[in-house]
């Protein structure tokens, strides 16, 4: 019964966030859930696992301003690496020139004749080299990185 009440509170809260009168950024939504003591319950409902690690990462994220934070700011949060930092910025500020080098992007780049690893590179140097190649492909196609990322994801995630 208690977990159902918590689930009902979390679901009610999200319905409130989605109303046109409340335009919260994702970070503001996470901040509000923390303030309402619903963040842990929401994480449990997602069934993602690793709740403590994710909870602590979210606490680090909500200290930042999503509209102005840099990749470096995001990477300073324990648990946030280059791919996630770029994903957050690229999809919250679509005009950013960044690449989220996930398996779909890397596979697409291989299909374009570029030698890439199968998994996101852990080396900052290699990540930057591949990001630059991806951005060049965006320029050649006259498409924003966020738009190409979404297009590739739709095509390769099937």
Language-model-detected regions and their locations in the chain:
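Alpha-helical ds-nucleic-acid-binding substructure associated with the helix-hairpin-helix region
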Residues: 11-78
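A short secondary-structure junction motif
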Residues: 1-8
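C-terminal accessory module of base-excision DNA glycosylases/AP lyases that mediates lesion recognition
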Residues: 50-62, 67-69, 76-158
